[in-house]
Design a protein with these regions (language model features):
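Secondary-structure end/capping motifs
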Residues: 232-314
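Short, glycine-/small- and polar/acidic-enriched structural segments
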Residues: 25-179, 183-190, 209-211, 216-217
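Flexible glycine/proline-enriched surface loops and loop-helix/loop-strand junctions
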Residues: 131-134, 177-178, 222, 243-245, ...
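Short, surface-exposed acidic
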Residues: 160-164, 203-207, 268-279, 318-325
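N-terminal export signals
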Residues: 5-24
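Short linear loop/turn motifs
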Residues: 63, 71, 167, 209-212, ...
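Pocket-lining segment of extracytoplasmic ligand-binding domains
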Residues: 171-175, 182-268
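Conserved C-terminal helix/tail region of periplasmic/extracytoplasmic solute-binding proteins
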Residues: 304-342
Length: 342
């Protein structure tokens, strides 16, 4: 109550300016958001914003749903089932080129450093990325790390076509990796490390080849949004991005609060594990030179272009998107409201 009272006392004018549709409609604006995955630390900033009333303070009634990966989330946003979703930007580019009428755009960057990676055992034969040539790697066809692997491989000087991919359900695949059935596993690094830790193989036993450490400049996930929502309710989209930014800045400053929000939404979640995951996300994808300079959610033209170019190379796309058809910054809050605090 004290926080909310203080917020009302000091920020009422700002809130009304950010959400002028409140007065016009006299009610909260409904907004649907897809996490793109199950309830875990990757969605902590959104869940914390909801828990702390940031969306409501800006005039929104936000419904946050779980998802089944980026491809599914993007399709749902493209079909109008959701206003926005957390999703891999490379997958969004691929979707837009296949469905030009969809016209989805990213309105904020969630993972400034790309979290895609390949994970191997320290005591195994793979000591450097080039050693992956001809090896067996766990990774499903929809897996973003698998889809972007060709860019990583070519940058390291080996032919990706010689790799044998094993399409095994993640839970079963993780267990088999620990048993030694595969040479490597393709994952978001924070997902793979903790999945394997839960099966008895700790981070100290693993080497992680993060694509961003080996030349990849692409952004990771962003807030992918529906064009009708952006056009018909621009103030609602601005309010959503501003409140979500607030939630993620809180998580960066206080990861324990973010993990607690995950636990509050999903009582079966392991709060300690989600705290560890959130710390990996914060330190590994959000506390970066770019976000420290430009704030959470912002993007630079050079890296946006790199995201397009690397996606085209990885997916074998015959055409690409101009930046204006892929990204807009008009829904971002002010630089002061994006600034990292922790």
């Amino acid at each position: 109550m004290q926080r909310r009272s203080l917020l009302r006392a000091t920020g009422a004018a700002t809130l009304l300016a950010a959400a002028p549709f409140i007065r016009a409609q006299g009610a909260l604006q409904k907004f649907k958001f897809n996490l793109g995955w199950k309830v875990e630390a990757s969605g902590a900033g959104f869940l914390l914003a909801l828990q702390r009333g940031y969306y409501k303070d800006l005039g929104l009634d936000v419904q946050i749903d779980t998802g089944n990966g980026s491809a599914s989330a993007i399709s749902l946003v493209g079909g109008g089932a959701y206003d926005s979703a957390s999703a891999d930007l490379s997958s969004m580019i691929e979707f837009n080129l296949a469905n030009p009428q969809a016209a989805l755009k990213a309105v904020a960057i969630q993972y400034d450093l790309n979290p895609n990676s390949v994970i191997v055992r320290k005591d195994g034969p793979i000591k450097k990325p080039g050693d992956l040539a001809g090896k067996t790697i766990l990774g499903q066809p929809f897996n973003a790390s698998r889809k972007l692997f060709p860019v990583f491989a070519k940058a390291q000087g080996f032919d990706p076509s010689g790799v044998k991919w094993e399409n095994v359900a993640p839970d079963i695949g993780d267990t088999r990796f620990v048993k030694g059935d595969f040479d490597a596993a393709a994952y978001f690094f924070f997902t793979g490390l903790l999945n394997l830790k839960a099966r008895g193989m700790g981070p100290e036993q693993l080497n992680v080849f993060r694509f961003s450490d080996y030349g990849m400049k692409s952004y990771g996930n962003g807030l992918v949004s529906n064009p009708k929502s952006m056009q018909d309710n621009p103030d609602a989209m601005k309010a959503f991005v501003k409140a979500s930014t607030h939630g993620w800045l809180d998580c960066i400053a206080d990861p324990k609060a973010g993990a607690a929000a995950v636990k509050a939404r999903e009582p079966l979640a392991n709060e300690a594990l989600e705290l560890e995951r959130l710390q990996l996300i914060v330190d590994g994808t959000m506390k970066t030179p770019d976000t420290k300079a430009n704030g959470w959610g912002a993007a630079t033209p050079a890296r946006l272009q790199a995201t397009i170019d690397e996606t085209a190379a990885a997916f074998g796309l015959k055409s690409t998107l101009p930046l204006a058809d892929f990204w807009t910054d008009k829904f971002l809050p002010s630089a002061a409201d994006r600034k990292l605090r922790g």
